[in-house]
């Protein structure tokens, strides 16, 4: 991947930093693995906004990604690496020996022509998927399952990874990039290596319109609203809001902890770094 800074030929180009993948496939995606991706505009079935700042954006199909990696013992060859508009990571189209094609997350250093495999007998190399009980302690992995057979849920975005720190019976302890240490079931699968396209974090959109292309609408400050719309709204002239920062629903923000999932607290060994 190459990081390209644009010449300031216009105000919108002045701050643009693009991440260009010279090895990405230039053609159309594999049609049998495409699905309709409807836009909601952030509205629910009653037509009410349930998620703010969503709407518009370019149309695109959803690429069906194999997060379960359950074709054990059947080798596959990487046919091409593709851009995916639905995620920060790139994806790889792989052809299995039985003729089936699937999309997977493209790990770092995976290239066209490489061979990958799933199952307990798979070698420890980037792109191979194994149960975590079969992965050596200290290994770097991504696409980690929280529940065996459910599919990968952790470490799926560009440049993400976990490190296996310890193995204790039915659980392994992994460290996330945030610094959080967490116990996950050792029967769950993970893929060797870290997710590719780590340069994604260097990207700068350069103008507001680039966010609109992605379906992201503007975020209006509460102090710019009326009292009916936000706790910070109203007042004569410009104000600071007159109270500690809160969300539109009155919950404290900017550092206030809102995590309520006590059910999974027992799996978190150490909270993330601040």
UniProtKB/Swiss-Prot annotation:
GO terms for biological process: cytoplasmic translation. Pfam families: Ribosomal_L2 (PF00181), Ribosomal_L2_C (PF03947). SUPFAM superfamilies: Nucleic acid-binding proteins, Translation proteins SH3-like domain. Residues 31-53, 223-263 are annotated as: Disordered. InterPro entries: NA-bd_OB-fold, Rib_uL2_dom2, Ribosomal_uL2, Ribosomal_uL2_bac/org-type, Ribosomal_uL2_C, Ribosomal_uL2_CS, Ribosomal_uL2_dom3, Ribosomal_uL2_RNA-bd_dom. Residues 39-48 have a biased composition (Low complexity). SMART domains: Ribosomal_L2, Ribosomal_L2_C. The keyword Protease does not apply. Belongs to the universal ribosomal protein uL2 family. One of the primary rRNA binding proteins. Required for association of the 30S and 50S subunits to form the 70S ribosome, for tRNA binding and peptide bond formation. It has been suggested to have peptidyltransferase activity; this is somewhat controversial. Makes several contacts with the 16S rRNA in the 70S ribosome. Part of the 50S ribosomal subunit. Forms a bridge to the 30S subunit in the 70S ribosome. HAMAP family: Ribosomal_uL2_B. This is Large ribosomal subunit protein uL2.
């Amino acid at each position: 991947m190459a990081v390209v800074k644009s010449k300031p030929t216009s105000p919108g180009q002045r701050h643009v930093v693009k991440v260009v993948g010279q090895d990405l496939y230039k053609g159309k995606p594999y049609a049998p693995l495409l699905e309709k991706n409807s836009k909601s505009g952030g509205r629910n079935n009653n037509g009410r906004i349930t998620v703010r700042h969503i709407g518009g954006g370019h149309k695109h199909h959803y690429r069906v990604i194999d997060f379960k990696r359950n074709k054990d013992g059947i080798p596959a060859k990487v046919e091409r690496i593709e851009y995916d508009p639905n995620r920060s990571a790139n994806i790889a189209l792989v052809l299995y020996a039985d003729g089936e094609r699937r999309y997977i997350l493209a790990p770092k250093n995976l290239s066209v022509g490489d061979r990958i495999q799933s199952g307990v007998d798979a070698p420890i190399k980037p792109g191979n998927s194994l149960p975590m009980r079969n992965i050596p302690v200290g290994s770097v992995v991504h696409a980690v399952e929280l529940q065996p057979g459910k599919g990968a849920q952790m470490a799926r975005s560009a440049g993400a990874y976990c490190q296996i720190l310890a193995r204790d019976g039915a659980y392994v302890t992994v460290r996330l990039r945030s610094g959080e240490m967490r116990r996950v079931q050792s029967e769950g699968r993970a893929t060797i290596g870290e997710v590719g396209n780590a340069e994604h974090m260097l990207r700068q959109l350069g103008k507001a319109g680039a966010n609109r292309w992605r379906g992201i609408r503007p975020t209006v400050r509460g102090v710019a609203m009326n009292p009916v719309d936000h706790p910070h709204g109203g007042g004569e002239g410009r104000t600071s809001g007159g109270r500690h920062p809160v969300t539109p629903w009155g919950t404290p923000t900017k550092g206030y902890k809102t995590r309520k999932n006590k059910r999974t607290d027992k799996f978190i060994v150490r909270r993330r770094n601040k």
